[in-house]
Structures are given as C-alpha cells and as structure tokens.
C-alpha cells in the first residue's frame, strides 16, 4: 500500500485523477504503476516487462527502487515493511 508521496502532483493524480502536476501523456502508464505499487507487498511486484525495475545506488539512495515511466522519467519509491513510501515522479537523468 502506498503510504506517502514526495511529489505533490503525483499524489493529486493518485487521489483525484488530476493530471495538472504530471506529464499528461504519462497518465495511463503512471496509473497502472501506481495501482500495482498500491497492491504489491515487495519490490519484485513491480518487476513487470518494460518497467525495468532496479534498486538505486548511492549512499542516500539505499533502499530506493525505480521503474521506467517513459524516456528519462522514473517512478521511484522506498519500502517500509510492505508499504511504499516517498513515492516520487522525476526526470533524473
């Protein structure tokens, strides 16, 4: 279950369906990813074809995971037990 968001636009999209804070073209894929993230209990639940799940590296990124939305855009998250926390939507390359 998703507990917390880092990206306000992504939270509004998840809660209300508003695309104001995200790339509108990414909405269908983000919706599928957020549904799956809300239902899964571990990172491997996000390991679907084309999503390119991987653990992030770096001192400050230990415990974070990323899936590819489109191009450079990623959905990143950490897990606290079986809950997703600090869910973010970012162009990080």
Please annotate each region the language model reported:
Residues 41-65:
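A short, surface-exposed loop/turn module that caps and links secondary-structure elements
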Residues 56, 60, 65-93:
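Enriched for short, Lys/Arg-rich terminal
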Residues 23-50:
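Short, solvent-exposed, low-complexity loop/linker segments
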Residues 1, 9, 18, 42, ...:
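Glycine-rich, flexible loop/turn motifs
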Residues 1-33:
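Arg/Lys-rich, positively charged N-terminal/basic patches that mediate binding to nucleic acids
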Residues 8, 12, 29, 44, ...:
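A broad, structure-centric signal for solvent-exposed, well-ordered loop/edge residues
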């Amino acid at each position: 279950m998703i507990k917390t968001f880092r990206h306000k636009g992504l939270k509004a999209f998840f809660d209300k369906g508003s695309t104001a804070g995200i790339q509108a073209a990414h909405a269908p894929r983000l919706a599928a990813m957020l549904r799956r993230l809300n239902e899964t209990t571990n990172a491997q639940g996000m390991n679907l074809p084309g999503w390119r799940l991987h653990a992030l590296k770096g001192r400050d990124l230990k415990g974070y995971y990323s899936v590819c939305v489109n191009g450079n855009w990623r959905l990143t998250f950490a897990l606290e037990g079986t809950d997703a926390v600090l869910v973010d939507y970012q162009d990080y390359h």
